[in-house]
Amino acid sequence: MISELSKHILAAGGKRIRPIITLLTSKLCNYEGKNHLSLAACIEFIHTATLLHDDVIDESKLRRGVATANDIFGNKTSVLVGDFLFSRSFELMVENGSKQILEVLSSASSTIAKGEVLQLTTVNDCSTSKETYLNIINSKTASLFAAAAEISAILSNKNKLIQNALITYGQKLGIAFQ
């Protein structure tokens, strides 16, 4: 079931921009190890899990012009595979061995969930403020972009100035992307 749904997700396409951010910022930081590869996968697992859950919540039938996983496999399967991807991402974080990276990605995951809840409270509310809308975007999108960039600075043992610059870069890119 996981394999089948995973093939569907891969075939559905997508830009994979979040893991690409991790790969490119690792290069920017002159990182020479291999841990950025599993962390890029971790970032994509988190993102994909949120998409699976989001499609169930929104009762979506299409994503990127292709039938959603929940439309094909059902809500229960989509939620469980999303949970599996979250679990697998945390296994990859632990395997990496950096408590700081675990903290960054755990925080981003929590922020994404809070953004989803906030969005649920504003659905069909035309009086939603610009501030609330930006908070939703920051939570649901920019937080993972920022984390994807920040972990490269951590992996590369860069100072706080560079780490903060990459966080800002990720946040701004995430807002623009949304």
Tell what function each PLM region has.
Residues M1-Q178:
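Mg2+-dependent prenyl diphosphate-binding active-site environment of isoprenoid biosynthetic enzymes
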